[in-house]
């Protein structure tokens, strides 16, 4: 069968077959009352190829065995069973790069007549050139073009786990756990200056197609922030020169960062983000506009030292000056506004030694100026 005039593409595999490129389907087999049995078939399709055997039943399931296949950046083998409008896929892939899936997956694509149930072993699961999660097992289901469930677990314990539950009452629950969280964050937020760490995320996806909203709780443990020019400027404004030198050298260690985020309508909203380390702690609230790349974030930075902690834990002193045990007495209130890559930093030079009431007044003043 001549396929040279056929054009086709698989964006997630970075595969394109132009109409002018050669293409052919060759097969050997025999016909019986039960259907067609192909003892050998071979597909050549531009730079892609596949070969195997097949049983095409007159009634019931169609079974296609792929002994080897190559399409763009994907290589593998497996079996496809087709019955009515259901596709069952079992197989093995040599490499799968999630970068291609992330950039080409369309959650609002036209409805497909097929439901899919795939069970795959992936030898190398990658995220661009930043991360290699090693061997993973993937189970995914899809109905009418919509992802209904997903279970992704690395062979090596605690490297990567992702779960998506079937939708219930309009909500899908998503959980993620991975190591090397700094590299994952740097992929989605380039130049974030995080290294190492373990990320745990629990969230909910809801809304209509085209207006999906993802709300999640995040928990980031044992990471290091290195260089981070924005943080360095805030430290400088806070007169914390010693910590700033550590930041530009070996980095500042944080034991944990927790909070909430909301991602939808082309915005990321940060709520009650608290990060605490051996030398400093941070609080953050604000918005990142993904269309304009503008940010509006406010926060506080305070040093972790014995005097600051001691004063914050004195009931009356800590409540009046610091706002409670969870916040330091000596803290600098700051704001980030403008373009995300080069925002304007404003800080209250008096807030480092000011009572909590003065800090709140400063925040209100800045918000009014906006």
What are the language-model segments listed below?
Residues 274-276:
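Short, glycine-rich nucleotide/cofactor-binding loops
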Residues 1-41, 53-254, 260-268, 280-370:
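Membrane-proximal interfacial segments on either side of biological membranes
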Residues 43-49:
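A short, well-structured beta->alpha microelement
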Residues 271:
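Short, charged beta-strand/loop "edge" motif centered at a coil->beta-strand transition
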């Amino acid at each position: 069968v001549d396929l040279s005039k056929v054009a086709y593409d698989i964006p997630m595999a970075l595969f394109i077959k132009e109409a002018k490129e050669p293409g052919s389907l060759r097969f050997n087999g025999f016909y019986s009352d039960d259907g067609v049995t192909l003892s050998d078939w071979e597909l050549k399709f531009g730079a892609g190829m596949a070969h195997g055997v097949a049983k095409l039943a007159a009634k019931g399931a169609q079974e296609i065995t792929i002994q080897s296949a190559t399409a763009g950046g994907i290589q593998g083998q497996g079996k496809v069973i087709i019955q009515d409008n259901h596709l069952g896929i079992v197989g093995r892939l040599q490499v799968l790069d999630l970068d291609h899936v992330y950039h080409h997956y369309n959650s609002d694509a036209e409805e497909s007549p097929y439901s899919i149930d795939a069970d795959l072993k992936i030898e190398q699961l990658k995220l661009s050139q930043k991360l290699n999660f090693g061997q993973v097992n993937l189970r995914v289901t899809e109905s009418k073009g919509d992802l209904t469930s997903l279970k992704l677990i690395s062979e090596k314990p605690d490297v990567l786990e992702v779960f998506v539950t079937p939708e219930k009452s309009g909500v899908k629950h998503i959980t993620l756990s991975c190591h090397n969280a700094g590299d994952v964050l740097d992929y989605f937020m380039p130049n974030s200056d995080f290294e190492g760490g373990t990320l745990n995320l629990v969230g909910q996806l809801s809304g209509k197609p085209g207006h999906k909203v993802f709300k999640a709780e995040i928990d980031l443990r044992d990471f290091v922030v290195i260089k981070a020019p924005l943080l360095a400027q805030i430290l400088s404004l806070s007169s914390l020169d010693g910590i700033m030198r550590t930041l530009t050298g070996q980095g500042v260690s944080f034991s944990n960062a927790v909070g909430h985020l909301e991602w939808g309508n082309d915005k990321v909203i940060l709520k009650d983000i608290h990060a605490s380390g051996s030398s400093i702690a941070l609080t953050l609230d604000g918005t990142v506009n993904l269309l304009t790349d503008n940010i509006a974030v406010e926060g506080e930075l305070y040093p972790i030292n014995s005097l600051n902690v001691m004063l914050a834990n004195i009931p009356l002193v800590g409540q009046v000056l610091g706002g409670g045990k969870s916040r330091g007495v000596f803290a600098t209130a700051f704001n980030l506004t403008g373009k995300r890559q080069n925002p304007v930093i404003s800080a209250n030079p008096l807030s480092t030694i000011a009572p909590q009431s003065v800090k709140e007044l400063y925040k209100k003043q800045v918000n009014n100026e906006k």
